[in-house]
Regions:
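Auxiliary Fe-S-binding modules of radical SAM enzymes
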Residues: 180-268
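A structural motif corresponding to the C-terminal end of an alpha-helix
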Residues: 95-102, 156-168, 232-252
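A short secondary-structure junction signal
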Residues: 84, 118, 141-144, 173, ...
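A general structural detector for well-ordered alpha-helical segments in enzyme core domains, enriched
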Residues: 88-92, 116, 150-157, 183-188, ...
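Hydrophobic faces of well-ordered beta-strands that scaffold small-molecule active sites
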Residues: 70, 104-106, 129-131, 168-172, ...
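Conserved Radical SAM active-site core
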Residues: 1-128, 136-139, 151, 163
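Active-site beta-loop-alpha junctions enriched in small/polar residues
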Residues: 75-77, 109-111, 132-136, 173-175, ...
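Conserved strand-turn element in the central/C-terminal portion of the radical SAM core barrel
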Residues: 147, 157-180
C-alpha cells in the first residue's frame, strides 16, 4: 500500500466478501481461489507471527523500526471470524509489543477487534485503529455487504476503542449511499477521532475500472441508486467534515497515508 513501508495479511481471503472489494480483481484472489468466489474462502497464514518477529528484529538491528509504517491489512480483514479460532492477529500484536514500529494501522470492520484493545492501547500513539463504516443505512449494508457486522455494532466498537485511549479513524471507504450529509457526519464525529472518506473512482486503484468489473453496477441499478461512479455525495461529506474537524478529515489515499508518511518520510 503506497505510503506505508509494509503491509501485513494474517489471512488470505476474506469471508466478509464485500461486493465492492477490489481484492476480488487481484492476482491474490486469482491465484488462491481454487475456482471459488470471493468471500467463500479464507486461509490462515499459520506461522505469520514468527515470520513477523524475524522481520521486525531485523529492522530493529538496522535502527529502521522507528521508520516502519505497517498497514494490517490491505487484502483481508484481520478480525474476520477465522481469527476467533486461529488468533493470528493477536499473535502478531504480541510481536508488535516486543518490537513496536513507528506506526501500526489496523484496518477492520469487525467488533472482534475489541478483544485486543489491551494490546492496542499499550502501543499508544504508535497504533491507529481504522474501522470501516461506509454508510449509516442498514438497508444499503444488507444489499452491498450482507455478511458484515451491523453499522451499530461497528460504531459501538469505535466508541469502546476511544474509551480505551486508542486513536480511532472511521473509514467511509468506499462511501455508499447514506441518509444525509449532516446526519451521517454527526454520527461519525460522535464515534471516531478522525474520518477518511473515499469513493469507488478515487479508491479502487483503477479509477473505477476495478469496481466496474464487480457486482456493484448491477446492484446500484437494481436498487435505484445514483450512478456508482458519481463522487458528489462522497465529496459533499468530506467537505462537511473538513469544515467541522479540519485536517482530522482525510480524502482517499492521502487520508489513509498521512500518518504513515510522517513516519517513513515517503512522499506518496
Amino acid at each position: 500500500m503506497k505510503g506505508f513501508s509494509h503491509t501485513l495479511q494474517p489471512y488470505i481471503g476474506c469471508r466478509f466478501g464485500c461486493s465492492y472489494c477490489y481484492v476480488s480483481q487481484s492476482n491474490v484472489h486469482r491465484f488462491y481461489n481454487g475456482g471459488m468466489e470471493w468471500g467463500s474462502y479464507v486461509y490462515p497464514r499459520v506461522g505469520i507471527a514468527e515470520r513477523l518477529e524475524t522481520e521486525l528484529a531485523t529492522l530493529h538491528r538496522r535502527d529502521a523500526l522507528e521508520r516502519a509504517a505497517i498497514f494490517m491489512s490491505s487484502s483481508t480483514d484481520p478480525y474476520q471470524g477465522a481469527e476467533r479460532t486461529y488468533r493470528l492477529t493477536r499473535q502478531c500484536l504480541s510481536v508488535f509489543q516486543k518490537y513496536p514500529p513507528g506506526l501500526l494501522v489496523i484496518q477492520t470492520r469487525a467488533p472482534l477487534a475489541a478483544r485486543d484493545f489491551d494490546v492496542m492501547a499499550a502501543l499508544g500513539k504508535r497504533c491507529l485503529l481504522n474501522l470501516t463504516i461506509e454508510t449509516d443505512r442498514e438497508d444499503v449494508r444488507r444489499v452491498l455487504t450482507p455478511h458484515c457486522p451491523s453499522i451499530q455494532q461497528r460504531l459501538e466498537t469505535a466508541r469502546q476503542a476511544r474509551e480505551h485511549g486508542i486513536t480511532t479513524q472511521l473509514t467511509v471507504s468506499p462511501c455508499l449511499p447514506f441518509s444525509g450529509v449532516e446526519a451521517f457526519g454527526e454520527l461519525l464525529l460522535e464515534s471516531g477521532d478522525r474520518v477518511i472518506v473515499d469513493s469507488y473512482v478515487a479508491g479502487d486503484g483503477g479509477g473505477g475500472k476495478r469496481t466496474a468489473r464487480t457486482a456493484i453496477p448491477g446492484l446500484y441499478a437494481r436498487s435505484g441508486w445514483e450512478d456508482w461512479r458519481s463522487q458528489e455525495a462522497a465529496l459533499s461529506l468530506y467537505d462537511w467534515l473538513s469544515r467541522r474537524i479540519g485536517n482530522l478529515a482525510g480524502w482517499s489515499r492521502e487520508g489513509f497515508t498521512r500518518q504513515a508518511r510522517s513516519v517513513t518520510g515517503n512522499v506518496c
